[in-house]
């Protein structure tokens, strides 16, 4: 399982490269350079140097003592990706891809962003490594995440609002790919999740697996054994695959949590694996939210980082073979979990992470006190305070 994808970029039937002919050469170049870089000890050493010296790794493993006592049942631990520089797991991948771009001689970066965290991470590494950075962001997300938009601009990036479609992450990705098709000779496209054509899903996983590798060591040190259950939120799914991957060959239950929005029985959700069907989106065969004519159905979630109508092809594969269970959590459940975590542990998680927390809170009381649940706290909630405030005042659309 740990050797996938195959040479065609497939995870079982999922993945691959469904792109215009003009992108086949740039993708082949990235793939070749990536394999060379991953086999080069000096590249790995430089990557780890920046993670530790610049981003602040290793991130902590926190025993959620108060929540454990309040909920009863299993002991709960948090892998604290919210403690990274820029406030989320996205920086792990951004540093890796920036170093690859530098290795390829590319000094201009294109990125797409939903919640703004990947955009901030891309802008951050562009500043760090002396690169130009263009960030495509849906106009709706620009409004929802105005703080992150200003952070990107402060960091020297150009933020390009996207006005097509639902004006969210899918549309930002469409525009970023369109721009890359026209400028692939001197631009490097820095995808923020385990989505897109091969080799991106594998590349982003390789730059995020540090999460699970650290957590594995930390849990063994804290408990003397691996966790019984690992839970992470899934939009595109990079924090989840980074968390799950080092445990896939172990007897560890893995649960991915999608955004149920206003309920999976409505049309306002982003539960792609739960409700989607096989299809192609952004160059990859995966599960997609689409109608009977194959048209993309606009997703919805209060979380700007989870309202994506596709999912990483490796997640599609893991769901298909039954290795990972995918469930969903509503806006209401996520916000309640965010409040409970803040009040009980003094940690304000991102709304994305709160989806994973909500599922953990449902499961923990049903488990033995000898079991452990490890939750990936993928990001901090500073960016979401206004959204939560609006929601609690009765208008999440503000």
UniProtKB/Swiss-Prot annotation:
Function of the protein: The beta subunit is responsible for the synthesis of L-tryptophan from indole and L-serine.
Assembly notes: Tetramer of two alpha and two beta chains.
Gene3D superfamilies: 3.40.50.1100
Organism this protein belongs to: Anoxybacillus flavithermus (strain DSM 21510 / WK1)
InterPro entries linked to this entry: Trp_synth_b_CS, Trp_synth_beta, Trp_synth_beta/beta-like, TrpB-like_PALP, TrpB-like_PALP_sf
Protein EC: 4.2.1.20
Cofactors required: pyridoxal 5'-phosphate
PROSITE patterns, alphabetized: TRP_SYNTHASE_BETA
Modified-residue entries (N6-(pyridoxal phosphate)lysine), positions: 90
Molecular function, one GO term: tryptophan synthase activity
Keywords of the record: Amino-acid biosynthesis, Aromatic amino acid biosynthesis, Lyase, Pyridoxal phosphate, Tryptophan biosynthesis
Record-given protein name: Tryptophan synthase beta chain
UniProt similarity note: Belongs to the TrpB family.
Reaction(s) catalysed by this chain's protein: (1S,2R)-1-C-(indol-3-yl)glycerol 3-phosphate + L-serine = D-glyceraldehyde 3-phosphate + L-tryptophan + H2O
Keyword Lyase: yes
GO terms for cellular component: cytoplasm
Pfam families: PALP
Gene from which this protein is expressed: trpB
Cited NCBIfam families: trpB (TIGR00263)
């Amino acid at each position: 399982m740990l050797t996938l994808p195959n040479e065609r970029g497939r995870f079982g039937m999922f993945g691959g490269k469904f792109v215009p002919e003009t992108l086949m050469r740039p993708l082949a170049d990235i793939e070749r350079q990536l394999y060379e870089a991953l086999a080069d000890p000096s590249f790995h050493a430089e990557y780890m140097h920046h993670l530790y010296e610049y981003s602040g790794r290793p991130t902590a493993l926190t025993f959620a003592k108060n929540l454990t006592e309040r909920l009863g049942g299993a002991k709960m631990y948090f892998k604290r990706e919210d403690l990274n520089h820029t406030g989320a797991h996205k920086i792990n991948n951004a540093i890796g891809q920036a170093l690859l771009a530098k290795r390829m001689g590319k000094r201009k970066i294109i990125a797409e962003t939903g919640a703004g965290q990947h955009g901030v991470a891309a802008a951050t590494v562009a500043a760090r490594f002396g690169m130009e950075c263009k960030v495509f962001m849906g106009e709706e997300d620009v409004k929802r995440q105005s703080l992150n938009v200003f952070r990107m601009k402060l960091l020297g990036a150009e933020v390009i609002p996207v006005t097509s479609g639902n004006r969210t992450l899918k549309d930002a990705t469409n525009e970023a790919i369109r721009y890359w098709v026209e400028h692939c000779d001197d631009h490097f496209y820095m995808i923020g999740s385990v989505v897109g054509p091969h080799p991106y899903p594998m590349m982003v996983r390789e730059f995020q697996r540090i999460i699970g590798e650290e957590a594995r060591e930390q849990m063994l040190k804290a408990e003397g054994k691996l966790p019984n259950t690992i839970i992470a939120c899934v939009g595109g799914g990079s924090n989840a695959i980074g968390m799950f991957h080092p445990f896939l060959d172990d007897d560890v239950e893995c649960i991915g949590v999608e955004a149920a929005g206003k309920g999976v029985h409505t049309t306002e959700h982003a539960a792609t694996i739960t409700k989607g069907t096989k299809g192609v989106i952004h160059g990859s065969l995966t599960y997609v939210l689409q109608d009977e004519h194959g048209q993309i159905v606009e997703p919805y979630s209060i979380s700007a980082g989870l309202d994506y109508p596709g999912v990483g092809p490796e997640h599609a594969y893991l769901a298909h073979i039954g290795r990972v269970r995918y469930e969903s959590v509503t806006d209401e459940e996520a916000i309640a979990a965010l409040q409970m975590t803040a009040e009980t542990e003094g940690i304000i998680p991102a709304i994305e992470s709160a989806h994973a927390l909500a599922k953990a809170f449902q499961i923990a009381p049903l488990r033995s006190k000898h079991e452990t649940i490890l939750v990936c706290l993928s990001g901090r909630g500073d960016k979401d305070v206004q959204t939560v405030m609006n929601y609690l005042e009765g208008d999440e659309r503000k």
